[in-house]
Amino acid sequence: MEHGNQRTVYVVQVDNNKDLSDAKKYGALRAVFGNPRKPYDTMSMIAKARRVMSEWQNGDHLLMVGDPTLCAVCMVVASEQDDIINVLSWDRNSFSYMPQRWDFGQMGLDYDDFEAADDKPL
């Protein structure tokens, strides 16, 4: 499928109990996973995410709905395509999705500048 300038919102996991209509303003919705059975066949799940997200392009968004493990898989797959990942996060105050821009290209391997959650150097 050639989608040119059409943006896509990759929905990690189908959840028919959620109203995702607000996310449509960021692009056409496309589900990555349905409701797979656990335990997951991890190799096939990664392959499926890569297949579904193979047309990821700069400007697309990832909507983190569903199992956190599958969300992590989709984040990694998206980062294989582009250093910059746009994520939609639900804002309970405005009742809308807010875009977040995650630039993984800015990350270095120098961990001396990082601190742990308890403020102790790593």
Where are the model-predicted features located?
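Long, low-complexity, Lys/Arg-enriched
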Residues: 1-61, 73-122
